[in-house]
């Protein structure tokens, strides 16, 4: 069965793209009785607040009709930012050589939190150089992954 995030991504991809943006990813965070639905969008020329407002109105209209979430939630629409979250194999592959921070569901090499450089993405497997040691992580074991911004 598909996760809520993947069902929402399927539902919202076309409306977001119709406005000229890419649906970068979706996070659904339950926080007690109230939850947060984060929709990340990207565009060729970046994203501004007006873009987020326009996408928010469109996404809100779709969610009102489809009603995929039965509890109260807050909708947030934003750009992925400099420490952008990564959701798909294609996104990880686009950042080979970059440093990432991963939170895992199951430990790899004794840890659920890893920081290292992406060395390769092969199908649904991610290779990561962590302190000179090559680790392989299944993408479905990644609970959350973010680029580590360099300043």
From Swiss-Prot:
Cystine pairs: none
Domain of life: Bacteria
Alphabetically ordered keywords of this record: Cytoplasm, Ribosome biogenesis
InterPro entries: Ribosome_maturation_RimP (IPR003728), RimP_C (IPR028998), RimP_C_sf (IPR036847), RimP_N (IPR028989), RimP_N_sf (IPR035956)
Primary location class: cytoplasm
CDD domains: YlxS_C
Keyword Heme listed: no
Example GO BP: ribosomal small subunit assembly
Pfam family, one: RimP_N
Regions that span the bilayer: none
GO cellular component, one term: cytosol
Compartments reported by the entry: Cytoplasm
Similarity comment: Belongs to the RimP family.
Function of the molecule: Required for maturation of 30S ribosomal subunits.
Alphabetical list of NCBIfam families matching this protein: PRK00092.1-1 (NF000927)
Protein name: Ribosome maturation factor RimP
Lineage: Bacteria, Pseudomonadati, Pseudomonadota, Gammaproteobacteria, Alteromonadales
Gene name per UniProt: rimP
